[in-house]
Amino acid sequence: MEIITDIASLRVRLQDEASIALVPTMGNLHAGHLSLVRIAQQHAACTVVSIFVNRLQFAPHEDYDRYPRTQENDCRLLEEYGVDIVFIPGEKTLFPIPQEFQLLLPPVADTLEGACRPGFFRGVTTVVLKLFNIVQPQVAIFGEKDYQQLQIICRMVAQLNLPVEIIAGQTIRAEDGLALSSRNNYLDNIQRQKASELACNLKKIGESIASGERNFPQLEWSAIERLNMHGWKVDYISVRQNRTLLPATACDSGLVILGAAWLDQIRLIDNFPLVLS
């Protein structure tokens, strides 16, 4: 496995590769990330994992400075998994001058996560587009855990005619249903025991819909009330069309239930995809 930190060296290393798969990450890797690595290895001759904590997607009051950075352990795990290249650019590598150009995003980027974290998706898409230009992969792997992000990146690729196929990896969960996330490291033992309640409530909505319930606002409100009663502060719970991310209607068959909520000072997000027959 090679660890590369500069763009020129990476391009030289990749120039003769028949096919390249990219797995963009912010590090602090867990089984969810590693499942994406396995998918990448099935789709290309060379697997590149990038590690970059993207300052652009953090608001000033958010956790950029304390976001877990575990580069040594990350590289050990990736070597065990047979990754070919780990690309770890510094901030000056990706942003040698102030970033003046950014994408104009569609309205969906201002809803849900975008409404709670203004500028988040602009920061995400800027760095993802940079990575696509640098690595020039044929395939890139993103997790369904960040469902709205996945859909926005798919739109970016389609509408900008980028020559890369986006493949989604399923959310990996702990035994109690909690979606694996780097921010789970913030949870203490008591919080960890409660953390799966968000996933359980999203799943409960999905089960109600699968059983024939179509009063989506009532299902959303009931889940929010249950979480609030258990000490959570909910940003949103919303039933959406799974591709457009517009509010779902009773006629839709492809759905996703998305949620974000605070457990004390820790913000968790999750989703529950649902396809009705």
Swiss-Prot record:
The reaction proceeds by a bi uni uni bi ping pong mechanism. It catalyses: (R)-pantoate + beta-alanine + ATP = (R)-pantothenate + AMP + diphosphate + H(+). This is Pantothenate synthetase. ATP binds at residues 26-33, 143-146, 172, 180-183. Pfam families: Pantoate_ligase. Pathway: Cofactor biosynthesis; (R)-pantothenate biosynthesis; (R)-pantothenate from (R)-pantoate and beta-alanine: step 1/1. NCBIfam families: panC. Its EC number is 6.3.2.1. GO terms for biological process: pantothenate biosynthetic process. Catalyzes the condensation of pantoate with beta-alanine in an ATP-dependent reaction via a pantoyl-adenylate intermediate. GO terms for cellular component: cytosol. It comes from Nitrosomonas eutropha (strain DSM 101675 / C91 / Nm57). The lineage of its organism: Bacteria, Pseudomonadati, Pseudomonadota, Betaproteobacteria, Nitrosomonadales.
